[in-house]
């Protein structure tokens, strides 16, 4: 069986297309890793080889994001949904460990994923409230992020265990252009951000975040593993909250496998880490480094988003982009046709050109082009050409 393939043009939202060189190397390593006679999925997660994979991946991520010494990198099984739970209980405990009392978490709801994260915190009986729901500022629909002047009064002078946001909402095509200044400038607020769909797509200042979580299967690897970047001070605060105190205050206890200090203390291997999945993630890190790092990747991503949105806007009598231009996602471009009855034809003709994965999320319909890091400018240009031709033919 050959490890060669024609470069895909797959715009699926995740699991997403991956760099072919990464998959080729991973396939070889699954059979015989570093000439040790075993595949990487067969080695002990506590062996020297596995430990080196863990350490190398952290080293490469630190280089890519310029992660300061104030923060720690670790990995957990699961995905973003697992993180919804672990963030809520760990960060609630951190606040108790620091202050000896509880405070609500605050959620900025800009789409379905931040909404689901809030709902999970409530389900677990972690004190939580919505600071704003973007639907309230956009006629009952997601697709806009309200200016912070409209909601910053809701956080001034108020204690929160953390403030949560999803930087890029894949379903609704909404992305925060930057972190809200009112959060960044408040030393009492720990920002917790879900970067599952835009991690390593653009430069960020890690020092501004209390916790970053990112599921792997969109921009950095295969499903089943999530990376975390956390302030070391938060880890210390979590450890400072005893189970007895948490019980007395009614704060749920985090299951041991998802207790952040325990995971960090055991180098992400307290529970058997899927080392093959982590190795693939590290191969992605190395691939981006070889391309010129996050700065080069960001320039490429901005070019892809630019030509795609320009094509849709130039044919605005035929296509509709239901997202405020101020917060249009550079990762997930959502759009609909203004003419009824053509959706299936659009997908069929796109597939004939090997442009796949364009169907919109079942909850919103229409179309979604996910242009993650692994999608080339050429692939997006091919989609742009098709979008223009389809509009001309069916206007």
UniProtKB/Swiss-Prot annotation:
Pyridoxal 5'-phosphate binds at residues 80-81, 113, 170, 194, 217, 271-272. Its EC number is 2.6.1.52. InterPro entries: Aminotrans_V_dom (IPR000192), Aminotrans_V_PyrdxlP_BS (IPR020578), Pser_aminoTfrase (IPR022278), PyrdxlP-dep_Trfase (IPR015424), PyrdxlP-dep_Trfase_major (IPR015421), PyrdxlP-dep_Trfase_small (IPR015422). It is an enzyme of class 2 (transferase). Disruption phenotype: Impairs growth in absence of serine and leads to adenine bradytrophy (slow growth). It holds the Pfam family Aminotran_5. Induction: Expression is regulated by the general control of amino acid biosynthesis mediated by GCN4. Expression is increased in response to DNA replication stress. It comes from the Eukaryota. The modification Phosphoserine is found at residue 112. GO terms for molecular function: O-phospho-L-serine:2-oxoglutarate aminotransferase activity; pyridoxal phosphate binding. It catalyses: O-phospho-L-serine + 2-oxoglutarate = 3-phosphooxypyruvate + L-glutamate; 4-(phosphooxy)-L-threonine + 2-oxoglutarate = (R)-3-hydroxy-2-oxo-4-phosphooxybutanoate + L-glutamate. The modification N6-(pyridoxal phosphate)lysine is found at residue 218. Coiled coil: none annotated. One of its GO terms (cellular component) is cytoplasm. Binds 1 pyridoxal phosphate per subunit. Present with 15900 molecules/cell in log phase SD medium. Phosphoserine aminotransferase (PSAT) is a pyridoxal 5'-phosphate-dependent enzyme involved in the second step of the phosphorylated pathway of serine biosynthesis. Catalyzes the reversible conversion of 3-phosphohydroxypyruvate to phosphoserine and of 3-hydroxy-2-oxo-4-phosphonooxybutanoate to phosphohydroxythreonine. Plays an indirect role in purine biosynthesis. NCBIfam families: PRK05355.1, serC_1. Belongs to the class-V pyridoxal-phosphate-dependent aminotransferase family. SerC subfamily. This is Phosphoserine aminotransferase. The lineage of its organism: Eukaryota, Fungi, Dikarya, Ascomycota, Saccharomycotina.
